[in-house]
Amino acid sequence: MLSAVIKPGINDYLGTLRVPFLLLNLSCVALGAGCAFWRRGSIDWTDALLALVGAVCAHASVNSLNEYSDFHTGVDSRTIRTPFSGGSGTLQRHPAMVGYALGIGLTCAAVTAAIGIYFVVACGWRILLVGILGLVTVSLYTPWLTRRPFLCLVAPGLGFGTCMVMGTDAVLGGDYSMAAFAASMVPFFLVSNLLLLNQFPDVEADRTGGRKNVLIVHGIRAGAAIYTLFQAGAYISVIVAVVVRILPPLSLLALLTVPLAVRTSIGAFRDGTDRDKLKPALGINVLINLLTPLLLASGLFLSR
């Protein structure tokens, strides 16, 4: 009865946006900016900031619309939340905020679209390629992509890797580049894995909510194997890019997080069915996603 009269606070209004997770955008935009800086020797920092705003709004839109959808399907009501999975719980505490979640999600998507239009006008139609892919991913992720196992797996990586890194590099560097494509493989694999590991504690709730991810279709063990392959893919892509001279040698700074990746892979196999024991791996997984693109970006900036 008491919860019914408690008014939403600032943390509740920020809750549907999943603000702590928005730090990931900074890492990915920094990586795209690093690619452009390494290629050109300078970048327009105003455009870099605008690209960051667009990226943050795109991510916030997905988060808020996902909370809206999970409230209606009941997914978040059936999950046992961890700091990294199960939704924010905002709409369960304040059901009247459901309209706000939808509104802020659509508003953030509109801001992203407006920034995208600006860059198309300023930089040319080629930017539309990643722009359209990004908007499609944002729009379809919760209602459609989460019900198709392979697309659900790779959609986060496409959004943060292909769209965010290559898009930032293109608007700051003037065109797409092989350097950005190679660099984008790091967040492609790691961010796909971020969402994959976060799905481990939510398998049963996602199943009853109509979702169909790789864990539901193929099981926890197969999910842990895919997670490990994707972790390896992120680091192997950097090594290959340096060997064939697409990226400079200092890009190997990204390999500093390999020991952390080994720990999370072991955790996925050993603790995949135990929510409490998996929590340390979930936290380390977030750290890997934040640090690895930043280390790679640092290597690119220092190589100029």
Which residues does each PLM region occupy?
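Topogenic membrane-insertion module of multi-pass membrane proteins
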Residues: 1-46, 50, 54, 146-156
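Small-residue-rich segments of transmembrane alpha-helices in multi-pass membrane proteins
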Residues: 23-32, 154-169, 187, 216-220, ...
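Membrane-embedded alpha-helical segments that form the functional core of polytopic membrane enzymes
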Residues: 31, 37-65, 129-135, 139, ...
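Acidic (Asp/Glu-rich) catalytic motifs at the cytosolic membrane interface
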Residues: 57-82, 193-215
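Multi-pass membrane catalytic core of lipid/isoprenoid biosynthesis enzymes
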Residues: 80-120, 215-247, 286-292
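Intramembrane alpha-helical segments
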Residues: 87-175
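Functional transmembrane core segments of multi-pass inner-membrane proteins
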Residues: 156-203, 209, 221-225
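Extended hydrophobic alpha-helices typical of membrane-associated regions
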Residues: 243-302
